């Protein structure tokens, strides 16, 4: 039987899980002899125990757990009297209530693909889309170029885990992809990583350019023109719908004699570029000569994909061709001493399509709008070209830019004239490097700059990070998520705070001072996001527990204790026999009182110490011991005694019924005054 006051019951405040680590926050201990904590984890029917000998924190991190697995946990404090066998039997401790938690699921990739950013003109940059499942505070995605098995894994994304993650900056090629998840535990130091999961399929990163749609519904109209000398003009027109393809840049009509087409194909064909118009007119088309026709849609894009041809059409002008002179009168040209003007007939109204002024050289191009404004105009006096729309070109000097990768092979950039990336000249350079598919930035000069090479951002001057809590310099940095404590003083247990603020109203970050014995200090914990200075989204403050101890009443002063026994000697002149009065006088003179039980005194003759007498005080009289040994004694056999009282004794074997602490053994009532008693006869230990 072991009698011992068990430590107070542990309270499990919260359990925060990772993939293989669980962070358990628990209550404080109130027993000063606590030396450790134990936790029992139950997985199905299997129970394991984890021991922690440190007591300097109120949390533990349990490792070697299984992702996505559900566990049941109980915890308890234990003191020095509790050994491993008692812990296994859960004897002499107060177990916490059970709490169930589930480990996080590691991130997995369910799909990987490449799409292009939508653009009106040219080729959009390729964007990688990664579909994921699982849980993480943040994740890391790495790609490996599949062209060579020795290529390294390259980190392309570190950030929040979302169902679909998008990122760019990946060069064209075939890639393997892998993902790992990370969870930050509230201690602010430990990060639980899931390890890498590699997607089994290789995916392609490429320019997902969709060629323009082909022209359709090609129609031929012939007109007979009696303008001095008879001729035939041919109008070719078509339809075009963008559909899912690229925007058209211009249309080109190609036509060739069928006989020549047989010999050389389209090599010697004649071409008419009509821009965005969807018709072309051929003046003086030959009579009874068969021709092949096609119309090409041309867009800004890669050279091999930017042209789409219509189906080839065959046409011959002969007696059976119906004539339609309607298109002849749709347009007109005015040429005089003042200007050259083009016009088109809209119903009964002629509308201007272009005008060249003879006096100034001013030019207006395009159909006028309701206010008379042309899409393009040139002012020769101010030397300004005005464009009401967009200009598509490969090089332009301007104050404002919209960078476009027109063919998929360009390196669009904005830069100060003469400035190149990374040089010492003052100015700016910002653009894309198509060799590495990474954006680059250079602002400043040789010594003062912000420079990004696609992987590393370098800033020569001081950097300050703005947060809701004020600016933080880069040397200090932003602290990660952490466990924080809040305190409040009161006479009864308060309700758990509902505000995520740190600290909530009425609470403090440090323990307050008590001004009365009736007051207690109460505590709660939570996981803080230092960026917002509030609890991490989705979490709350733990249940409130009492942090301060219970104030006890003052104790009564104890009685003066008895002097402990000792061994003494006394020189007496002309000593011939033991003298009680001399012995009693020795203790009265030196200690102010008579001898105490077990005091030992040796009286010897002055000048002849060989004459000596030793007695022990038994509490009422001086008695002669059976043997007196002046010095050390080594006994190989057995020493049998009804009582042994000693300051130090070294015994390899001892056979006794009861062992008391020394003060109790010296008292007149050891059973009533002992602090510790070992009863070897009945088999129990008792500590008061």
Swiss-Prot record:
GO cellular component: virus tail
UniProt KW keywords: Late protein, Viral tail protein, Virion
Compartments where found: Virion
Coiled-coil regions listed: none
Function (record text): Together with BHP-pb3, forms the central straight fiber, bearing the receptor binding protein RBP-pb5 at its C-terminus. Upon RBP-pb5 binding to the host receptor FhuA, the central fiber reorganizes and undergoes structural rearrangements that lead to its bending, bringing BHP-pb3 close to the host membrane for anchoring.
Subunit: Homotrimer. Interacts with baseplate hub protein pb3. Interacts with receptor-binding protein pb5.
Protein name (record): Straight fiber protein pb4
The organism of origin for this protein: Escherichia phage T5 (Enterobacteria phage T5)
Lineage: Viruses, Duplodnaviria, Heunggongvirae, Uroviricota, Caudoviricetes
Gene symbol of the encoding locus: D17
């Amino acid at each position: 039987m072991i009698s011992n006051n068990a430590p107070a019951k542990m309270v499990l405040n919260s359990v925060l899980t990772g993939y293989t680590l669980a962070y358990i926050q628990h209550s404080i201990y109130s027993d000063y002899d606590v030396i450790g904590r134990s936790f029992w984890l139950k997985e199905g029917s299997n129970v394991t125990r984890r021991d922690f000998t440190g007591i300097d924190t109120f949390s533990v991190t349990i490792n070697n757990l299984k992702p996505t697995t559900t566990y049941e946990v109980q915890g308890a404090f234990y003191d020095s009297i509790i050994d491993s066998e008692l812990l296994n039997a859960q004897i002499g401790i107060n177990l916490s209530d059970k709490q169930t938690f589930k480990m996080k699921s590691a991130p997995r990739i369910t799909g990987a693909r490449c799409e292009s950013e939508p653009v009106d003109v040219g080729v959009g940059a390729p964007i990688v889309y990664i579909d994921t499942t699982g849980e993480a505070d943040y994740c890391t995605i790495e790609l490996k170029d599949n062209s060579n098995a020795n290529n390294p894994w390259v980190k392309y994304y570190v950030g929040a885990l979302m169902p679909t993650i998008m990122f760019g900056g990946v060069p064209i090629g075939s890639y393997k992809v892998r993902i790992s998840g990370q969870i930050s535990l509230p201690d602010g130091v430990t990060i639980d990583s899931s390890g890498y999961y590699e997607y089994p399929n290789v995916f392609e990163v490429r320019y997902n350019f969709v060629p323009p749609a082909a022209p359709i519904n090609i129609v031929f109209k012939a007109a007979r023109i009696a303008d001095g000398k008879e001729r035939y003009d041919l109008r070719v027109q078509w339809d075009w719908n963008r559909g899912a393809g690229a925007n058209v840049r211009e249309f080109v009509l190609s036509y060739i004699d069928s006989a020549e087409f047989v010999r050389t194909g389209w090599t010697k064909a004649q071409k008419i570029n009509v821009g965005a118009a969807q018709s072309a007119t051929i003046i003086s088309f030959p009579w009874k000569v068969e021709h092949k026709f096609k119309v090409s849609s041309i867009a800004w894009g890669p050279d091999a994909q930017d042209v789409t041809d219509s189906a080839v059409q065959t046409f011959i002008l002969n007696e059976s061709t119906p004539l339609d002179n309607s298109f002849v009168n749709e347009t007109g040209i005015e040429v005089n001493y003042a200007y050259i003007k083009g016009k088109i007939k809209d119903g009964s109204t002629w509308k201007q399509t272009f005008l060249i002024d003879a006096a100034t050289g001013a030019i207006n191009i395009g159909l006028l709008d309701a206010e008379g404004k042309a899409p393009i105009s040139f002012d020769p006096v101010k030397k300004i070209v005005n464009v009401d729309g967009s200009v598509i070109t490969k090089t332009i000097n301007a104050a404002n830019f919209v960078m476009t990768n027109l063919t998929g092979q360009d390196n669009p950039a904005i830069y100060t004239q003469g400035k190149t990336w990374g040089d010492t000249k003052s100015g700016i350079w910002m653009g894309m490097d198509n060799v590495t598919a990474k954006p680059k930035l250079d602002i400043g000069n040789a010594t003062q700059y912000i420079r990004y090479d696609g992987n590393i951002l370098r800033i020569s001057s001081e950097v300050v990070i703005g947060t809701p809590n004020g600016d933080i310099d880069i040397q200090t940095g932003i602290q990660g998520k952490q466990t924080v404590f809040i305190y409040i003083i009161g006479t009864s247990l308060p309700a758990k705070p509902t505000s995520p603020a740190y600290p909530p109203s009425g609470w403090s970050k440090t323990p307050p001072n008590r001004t009365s014995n009736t007051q207690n200090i109460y505590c709660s914990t939570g996981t803080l996001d230092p960026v917002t200075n509030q609890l991490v989204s989705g979490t709350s403050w733990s249940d409130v527990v009492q942090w301060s101890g219970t104030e006890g009443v003052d104790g009564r002063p104890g009685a003066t204790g008895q002097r402990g026994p000792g061994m003494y000697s006394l020189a007496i002149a002309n000593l011939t026999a033991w003298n009680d009065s001399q012995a009693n006088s020795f203790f009265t003179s030196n200690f102010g009182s008579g001898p105490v039980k077990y005091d030992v005194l040796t009286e010897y003759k002055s000048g002849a110490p060989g004459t000596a007498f030793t007695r022990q005080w038994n509490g009422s009289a001086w008695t002669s011991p059976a043997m007196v040994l002046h010095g050390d004694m080594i006994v190989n056999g057995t020493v049998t005694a009804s009582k042994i009282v000693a300051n130090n004794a070294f015994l390899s074997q001892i056979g006794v019924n009861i062992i008391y602490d020394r003060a109790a053994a010296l008292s007149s009532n050891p059973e009533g005054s002992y602090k510790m008693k070992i009863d070897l006869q009945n088999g129990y230990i008792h500590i008061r």
